[in-house]
Amino acid sequence: MQQRPIQFPALGIAPIHMPLFSHKVAAGFPSPADDYIEGRLSLDEHLIQHKDSTFFVRAKGNSMIGAGIFDGDLLVVDKSLNPVSGDIVIAVVDGDLTVKRLMKRGHEIFLKPENHRFKEIEFKDGQELQVWGVVTSTVKQFVRG
């Protein structure tokens, strides 16, 4: 039985342009005065480079906390990018999706977690690594609603 990848298409909604303040924020809030507005920023245009090849998926677990990816984070994944060593990728391992850092050591390719409590995933002869895409961004929510 051949498995077909599950598709997670980018959201097909019109961009919403929000104000981008030029004032840098250390521990306060910028004045809402128009003098500080640098321009307008659309998050989908900022986060998505290739609309037709981008999908979203939620992170599960804490194997990537060292890379700033936490349980429940929304990952922006571009499947048009060719993964290179050091990229964070979505891969299929033994039929399950995982997010890990793709690494190359000599001729060996492996997936590295960013949490010392987890082991590297090494591939033996005959095992296939299927990369679904490169993680380009994360979206974090601090207030659940």
Label every model-predicted segment.
Residues 76-77, 90:
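Hydrophobic beta-strand signal
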Residues 1-65, 97, 119, 126, ...:
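Short, positionally conserved secondary-structure boundary motifs
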Residues 85-99, 103-109:
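Short, compositionally biased
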Residues 72-73, 87:
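Structural motif
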Residues 31-32, 109-114:
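Short, solvent-exposed secondary-structure boundary/capping segments
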Residues 66-67, 75:
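Charged, well-structured alpha/beta interaction segments
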